[in-house]
């Protein structure tokens, strides 16, 4: 078996093995922490991530608001708490090895607010943000605000060209890579 050579990803030498960041709690702090602990890049989903109580039990996402707006605000709070929770779990499991990324969907509701909330609450725990599902123009600016690398997911060279011209060229030093799907 031939050994893998490391690559510089999100500011560190790691194995070129990257967890994809599957959504809705499939890729979580445990899976991403394990990938990072093995020397690769772990990616947890920041979409509706689970949060836990003091006993380690999942906190059910129950909405008590009487209006759509109130329930939306509850959803945002759950998303931020869950993302921070998964980042902490991943960071603890990684033990300082590898890199940790968060994956979000640009077109989900309140993406920017949720991103800021998670990244503010998980400072120093996350090294990069992967983002697709739309044209994530502001992912570069938001990631740069927190000193993080960003990895847009694009569907074509034309889409990337538009993103580059409109936003990414201003933050090219933190563009960690581009995911094509």
Task: Label every PLM stretch briefly.
Residues 1-181:
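Active-site entrance/lid segments in N-terminal catalytic domains of soluble metabolic enzymes
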């Amino acid at each position: 078996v031939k050994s893998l050579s490391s690559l510089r990803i999100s500011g560190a030498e790691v194995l070129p093995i990257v967890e994809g960041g599957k959504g809705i709690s499939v890729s979580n702090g445990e899976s991403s922490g394990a990938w990072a602990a093995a020397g690769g890049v772990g990616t947890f989903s920041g979409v509706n991530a689970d949060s836990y109580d003091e006993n380690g039990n999942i906190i059910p996402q129950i909405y008590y608001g009487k209006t759509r707006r109130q329930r939306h605000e509850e959803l945002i709070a759950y998303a931020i708490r869950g993302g921070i929770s998964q980042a902490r779990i991943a960071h603890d499991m990684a033990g300082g090895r590898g890199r940790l990324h968060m994956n979000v969907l640009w077109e989900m509701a309140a993406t920017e607010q949720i991103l800021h909330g998670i990244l503010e609450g998980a400072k120093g725990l996350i090294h990069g943000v992967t983002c697709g599902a739309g044209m994530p123009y502001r992912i570069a600016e938001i990631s740069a605000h927190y000193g993080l690398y960003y990895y847009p997911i694009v569907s074509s060279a034309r889409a990337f060209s538009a993103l580059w011209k409109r936003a990414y060229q201003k933050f090219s030093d933190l563009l960690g890579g581009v995911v094509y799907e």
